[in-house]
């Protein structure tokens, strides 16, 4: 068996990636989220595949087909709620994974980090298009509002929006193409994940100290396969509690009303995992400015390697930057809350303050904190 594992051209790749991979001996549970994201992706592809067997991407039957899946298909309700809540688990793992990367300075592995940002954009695009498919009120109006943002692009904006819509409003053509893209994107994401792993295995994993761990490596299997399996059990437990006991807690009640272009819901808002970006978008009165801020709220992650001023990699031994980091986390929670609130006083002011704080902490305060720590520790 050892010979096959090490010699066979295909199994050899798996061996070098998941079995004999040299891993730092001290990586904590924060390093579990990569494998958990892989699990989430597999769950989403499998449940999505079974949903696609029964779903029809036509405006007149889309809503009914989802109801049919829940009522008439064997375990259709389970597959549907696993898919809907699987997206939430996916984003929880994603945010924790990115947060870990920022805390421990993993962004210094630039190729891996940039690939991760591309993956984040791809997953967000997939989730947005998936939310449109049930063709409820929030599906329709969410699609209308978000795609309409592209009209802010000078000169080509309106033409671009009508091209994406396939007409003069969100209609049958839009739903059909969103279904097509929603189906294909997870497979593209899977390919990007392999590239992400390829780049990671060029440098090896980071570790909680941020120091070089070449002198102290252990094989991935059995140590981290067992450790990851514990994470898998915890995730599946939380996931199934969510799916079986509180399946609608993260959804919007408006989406149980079929899409009606003549009736606008009182508060149009996306799923909870987009609320922080939605709050940043809404906090700028200008349409184009809002769109740019929305894109920058994620794209700013690409600047993190350039904004790294400290002589140390991780925040483990850097209390000032640690404080900035946790203020940033609190700020993102505030933005998430604001994104779900109506556009009125005092929420507008809080949203604008939190949006300014978000960019200021990343671009100004964290780099300055790094320089101060260098001086304190006399690392210049």
Curated annotation (Swiss-Prot):
Disulfide bond sites: none
Residues reported to bind heme b b562: 83, 182
Cofactor annotation: heme b
GO BP annotations, alphabetical order: mitochondrial electron transport, ubiquinol to cytochrome c
Bilayer topology term: Multi-pass membrane protein
Cofactor note: Binds 2 heme b groups non-covalently.
The entry's keywords: Electron transport, Heme, Iron, Membrane, Metal-binding, Mitochondrion, Mitochondrion inner membrane, Respiratory chain, Transmembrane, Transmembrane helix, Transport, Ubiquinone
Subcellular location: Mitochondrion inner membrane
Residue sites binding heme b b566 per the record: 97, 196
InterPro entries: Cyt_b/b6_C, Cyt_b/b6_C_sf, Cyt_b/b6_N, Cytb/b6-like_sf, Cytochrome_b, Cytochrome_b_C_euk/bac, Cytochrome_b_N_euk/bac, Di-haem_cyt_TM
A GO cellular component entry from the record: respiratory chain complex III
Binding site for a ubiquinone: 201
TM spans (from-to): 33-53, 77-98, 113-133, 178-198, 226-246, 288-308, 320-340, 347-367
GO MF annotations in UniProt: metal ion binding; ubiquinol-cytochrome-c reductase activity
General remark: Heme 1 (or BL or b562) is low-potential and absorbs at about 562 nm, and heme 2 (or BH or b566) is high-potential and absorbs at about 566 nm.
Subunit organization: The cytochrome bc1 complex contains 11 subunits: 3 respiratory subunits (MT-CYB, CYC1 and UQCRFS1), 2 core proteins (UQCRC1 and UQCRC2) and 6 low-molecular weight proteins (UQCRH/QCR6, UQCRB/QCR7, UQCRQ/QCR8, UQCR10/QCR9, UQCR11/QCR10 and a cleavage product of UQCRFS1). This cytochrome bc1 complex then forms a dimer.
Function: Component of the ubiquinol-cytochrome c reductase complex (complex III or cytochrome b-c1 complex) that is part of the mitochondrial respiratory chain. The b-c1 complex mediates electron transfer from ubiquinol to cytochrome c. Contributes to the generation of a proton gradient across the mitochondrial membrane that is then used for ATP synthesis.
Protein family membership: Belongs to the cytochrome b family.
Protein name: Cytochrome b
Species: Chionomys roberti (Robert's snow vole)
Gene label: MT-CYB
């Amino acid at each position: 068996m050892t010979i096959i594992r090490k010699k066979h051209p295909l199994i050899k790749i798996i061996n070098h990636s998941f079995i004999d991979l040299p891993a730092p001996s001290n990586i904590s549970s924060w390093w579990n989220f990569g494998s958990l994201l892989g699990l989430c992706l597999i769950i989403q592809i499998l449940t999505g595949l079974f949903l696609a067997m029964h779903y029809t991407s036509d405006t007149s039957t889309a809503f009914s087909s989802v109801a049919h899946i829940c009522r008439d298909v064997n375990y259709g309700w389970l597959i549907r709620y696993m898919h809907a809540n699987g997206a939430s688990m996916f984003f929880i793992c994603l945010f924790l994974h990115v947060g870990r990367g920022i805390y421990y300075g993993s962004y210094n592995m630039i190729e891996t980090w940039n690939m991760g940002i591309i993956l984040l954009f791809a997953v967000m695009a997939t989730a947005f298009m998936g939310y449109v498919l049930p063709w409820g009120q929030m599906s329709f109006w969410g699609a209308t509002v978000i795609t309409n943002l592209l009209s802010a692009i000078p000169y080509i904006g309106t033409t671009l929006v009508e091209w994406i819509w396939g007409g003069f409003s969100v209609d049958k053509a839009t739903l059909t193409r969103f279904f097509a893209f929603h189906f294909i994107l997870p497979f593209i994401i899977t390919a990007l994940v392999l590239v992400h792993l390829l780049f990671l295995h060029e440098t090896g994993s980071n570790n909680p100290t941020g120091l070089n761990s070449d002198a102290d490596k252990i094989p991935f299997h059995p140590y981290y396969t067992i450790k990851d399996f514990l994470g898998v059990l915890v995730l599946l437990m939380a996931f199934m509690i969510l799916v079986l006991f509180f399946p609608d807690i993260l959804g919007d009640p408006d989406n149980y009303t079929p899409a009606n272009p003549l009736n606008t819901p009182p508060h149009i808002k996306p799923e909870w995992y987009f609320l922080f970006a939605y709050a940043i978008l809404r906090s700028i009165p200008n349409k184009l400015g809002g769109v740019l801020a929305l894109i920058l709220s994620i794209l700013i992650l690409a600047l993190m390697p350039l904004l790294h001023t400290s002589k140390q990699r991780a925040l483990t031994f850097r209390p000032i930057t640690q404080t900035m980091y946790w203020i940033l986390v609190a700020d993102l929670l505030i933005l998430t809350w604001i994104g779900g609130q109506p556009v009125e006083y005092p929420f507008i002011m809080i949203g604008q303050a939190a949006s300014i704080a978000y960019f200021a902490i990343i671009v100004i305060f964290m780099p300055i904190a790094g320089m101060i720590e260098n001086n304190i520790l006399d690392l210049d």
